[in-house]
Swiss-Prot record:
One of its GO terms (biological process) is electron transport coupled proton transport. [4Fe-4S] cluster binds at residues 59-60, 124, 154. This is NADH-quinone oxidoreductase subunit B. NDH-1 shuttles electrons from NADH, via FMN and iron-sulfur (Fe-S) centers, to quinones in the respiratory chain. The immediate electron acceptor for the enzyme in this species is believed to be ubiquinone. Couples the redox reaction to proton translocation (for every two electrons transferred, four hydrogen ions are translocated across the cytoplasmic membrane), and thus conserves the redox energy in a proton gradient. The lineage of its organism: Bacteria, Pseudomonadati, Pseudomonadota, Alphaproteobacteria, Hyphomicrobiales. GO terms for molecular function: 4 iron, 4 sulfur cluster binding; iron ion binding; NADH dehydrogenase (ubiquinone) activity; NADH:ubiquinone reductase (non-electrogenic) activity; quinone binding. It is a peripheral membrane protein. It comes from Beijerinckia indica subsp. indica (strain ATCC 9039 / DSM 1715 / NCIMB 8712).
Amino acid sequence: MGLIATPQPVVGTPPAQDNYFLSINDQLADKGFLVTSTDELINWARTGSLMWMTFGLACCAVEMMQMSMPRYDCERFGFAPRGSPRQSDVMIVAGTLTNKMAPALRKVYDQMPEPRYVISMGSCANGGGYYHYSYSVVRGCDRIVPVDIYVPGCPPSAEALLYGVLLLQKKIRRTGTIER
């Protein structure tokens, strides 16, 4: 009785991305060079080198930290953390945003270089969450900064945040460099 081993795709790699890289490899093998537009090339490079910074305000920040640990390892998708807003492309707002913290959020967002993206993580960042009716809570960080991706949950899992990162990469690939 023998075992038949079939090759499995790498966990976490979307099949569309595999097909994209396979077509690039085929073109390079056939012709020895690659023909593409500058927009596609810049967007491809941008999706593989997203630098994120945290704006962790509450319990969602724990799941955000878990996403960068070895189990999920967001750096294999080209999503690496940075400590300064001047070195970051993406800001993850995780947790309850209060009225007192809103100007600081806007200041950090303004310090980020263009193009910049925002991921709103969790019910509190998306719409106020459990504290929606409190006098001191902003009912969604999209009232302060433009949000590109919303990740629902209380708190959302690390898988959900990683899926949001992949959606952001797909969005960047679709938009042109000049259009944003």
